[in-house]
Structure formats: C-alpha cells, structure tokens
Amino acid sequence: MGCCTGRCTLIFICTLQMLVALERQIFDFLGYQWAPILGNFLHIIVVILGLFGTIQYRPRYIVAYTIWTAFWVAWNVFIICFYLEVGGLSKDTDLMTFNISIHRSWWREHGPGCVWRLVPAPPSKNLGDHSFISVTGCIIEFQYIEVIHSAVQILLSLIGFVYACYVISVITDEEDSCRHK
C-alpha cells in the first residue's frame, strides 16, 4: 500500500482527533465541566478503537468508530447550541457540570486578552466560598472559543466518517476477493 492510502489518511485523522480531544479534555478539566469530560473520555477511547481497527484491518472496530462519529457530531452540535443559547439553552446554567457546582468554562475567565478581577458579591447572591469575578477585555468571548472547539471536532469527525466508510469498503472488498480465489 502507498503512503497516501485511505487507511493512512484515516490513521492521521484519528491521531489528529485524539490530539484535539486531549487538548479539549485538559481545558474541560480546568473548568470542571463534567459532561464534556465524560464525552471527551468516551471519544478518546473510541478513536483509539478506530485507530486499532484501522491498523489491524478490523472492520468491526472501524464500524464502531463510524457509528460513534455520528453521536460525536450530535454532541458537538448540542455544545454549539448550548454556548450560542439556541433553543432555550443557556450557557449560564450548570448543565455542563451536572448541576453539582457553579463552575463554568475555563475560557470564561482565561480567554485571550481577558482581564479578571475579584469584586464583592452582591448581597442577593449566595455564592458560598466562591468569589464573584468580573471579566473584561476579552479578544474573543469564551462561548466562541467553545464553538470553535466543537466546530473543529465536527469537521474532523465528518472527514473521519467518510474515510472510515472508505476503509471499511476497501477492507471488506479485499476480504471478499481473498475468499473467492
């Protein structure tokens, strides 16, 4: 097989997906975003499974990866809708932390150019041990950074889906041709 086969391309796409998911996982951990952490963890496992299936010529594993990419695209579309507040969703809810904490996206306070300062909490808000933080001067708002992360994940997943279907087709055709000899 040549270097630029569909199989090699799928290996490259899966590796790139894993790197992007690991980067996203780190920032979700920093922001205590438990729902995305769980999703990223499952995604990394399935991408490893897809890599293994591609390297070892196991079409069933690649099929599992292909099915997962459909769920992964749907999850990332949900994330985009969540941060852009589409359909009654609100980025100010605790949905991403399973309603167990008031943490938000790490990018909310640490985005490019953001300057944050502690301010006294209004008496009407009971924040417990948490501080009230004012963030100003961000070059790009945190929700757009999250949307960009999800859009990159969707793009890689769609490309991975196409190449996975192609590789499955090639592998099964090779198996069929070997059986008929």
From Swiss-Prot:
Keyword set includes Repeat: no
Cited Pfam families: NKAIN
Keyword Ribonucleoprotein: no
Keywords: Cell membrane, Membrane, Transmembrane, Transmembrane helix
Residues spanning the membrane: 5-22, 35-55, 62-82, 151-171
Superkingdom of the source species: Eukaryota
Membrane topology label: Multi-pass membrane protein
GO cellular component: plasma membrane
Compartments (UniProt record): Cell membrane
Main location: membrane
PANTHER family named in the record: SODIUM_POTASSIUM-TRANSPORTING ATPASE SUBUNIT BETA-1-INTERACTING PROTEIN 3, T-CELL LYMPHOMA BREAKPOINT-ASSOCIATED TARGET 1-RELATED
UniProt family annotation: Belongs to the NKAIN family.
Oligomer and partners: Interacts with atp1b1 C-terminus.
The protein's name: Sodium/potassium-transporting ATPase subunit beta-1-interacting protein 3
Species this chain originates from: Xenopus tropicalis
Lineage: Eukaryota, Metazoa, Chordata, Craniata, Vertebrata
